[in-house]
C-alpha cells in the first residue's frame, strides 16, 4: 500500500561481534545493505530511499569506527521516526569480552578504541561497550554471537527477519550452563542451580533434560514445583508489561551448572506453557556438548 511505512533495519553493536557477516547474510536475504554509513547521513540517505520504489528491504550497518559520529545515532533515529516516514528496527550484535579478545588476536586487528595500538585490547573493548550502552538499551533485537557458528547466526537472522509475516511479539526460552558463561543477550536470567541435580544420580548423569527420565526427576521434585509455579506467575505478570513497552522479542535464560539437566528441563516446561499464549522459540545452548553420538 502507498501509505505503508518502509522498513529500515539498523545493524550495530560491538566491533568484532559479526556485523560484516550479518551484512552479507542480509544481502543474501534480499536486503539492500549499506555498510559503515555515518549516522549524520542517515536522514539524507533515507530521503533517497523513501523517494524510490526500487528498495523495499533496507539495512544500514553503523559502527564505532568514527566515535564522534556514533553519538548522533540515537538522535538521528528519533528524528526519522518523529517525522513519521520510517519505522526503524535496531539489531544489536554483541559478544563476550573473552570472545572478542580471541577474535581480535586471531585477525591481528585492534578494536576502534584501542588507543592507536598503545592501549590494551580489553580496555578498548570495555570502553566501546560503555559508549554503546544507550543504543543497546534502545535496540529491538540483541543477538549474542559468542557461541554461534556463522550458519547458526544466519538461521537466527532468517527466523527473525524473513519475509514471512511475523508476530509483533515473540519469546525465546534458552537453557545454558553458568560454567560456560552467562548469555549476554538475555532479558531475564533465572538461576536454577539450587534445584536437585540429576548429575549425582548415576543412571541419569549421561542424559539431558530432553530425556523423559531426567525431565520427570527434575520437575516432580517438590521444590521444583513450588519454584516453577512462582516463576510462571511472575512471567505471566511481567510479559504484558514488556509488550506494552514495545518489546518485540523477550529472551528468558534458564541456567544451571552445565546446561545439561535442570535448566533444560525447566526451559522445556516453560516454553510449553508460554507457547499457549505467545510465539515461543526454544534454544538449548549447551546441548550439543552432551548429546550422545
Swiss-Prot record:
High-level lineage:
Bacteria, Bacillati, Bacillota, Bacilli, Lactobacillales
Q: Where are the transmembrane segments?
A: none
What is the protein name stated in its UniProt record?
Nucleotide-binding protein LBA0691
In which family does this protein belong, per the annotation? Answer: Belongs to the RapZ-like family.
Molecular function terms in GO for this entry? ATP binding; GTP binding
The record describes the protein's role as:
Displays ATPase and GTPase activities.
Which NCBIfam families does the protein's record reference?
Answer: PRK05416.1 (NF003828)
Keywords for this protein:
ATP-binding, GTP-binding, Nucleotide-binding
Q: Where does ATP bind?
A: 13-20
Q: Which InterPro entries match?
A: P-loop_NTPase (IPR027417), RapZ-like (IPR005337), RapZ-like_N (IPR053930), RapZ_C (IPR053931)
Entry binding sites for GTP: 63-66
Entry's Gene3D superfamilies? P-loop containing nucleotide triphosphate hydrolases
Alphabetical list of HAMAP family matching this protein: RapZ_like (MF_00636)
Entry superkingdom = Bacteria
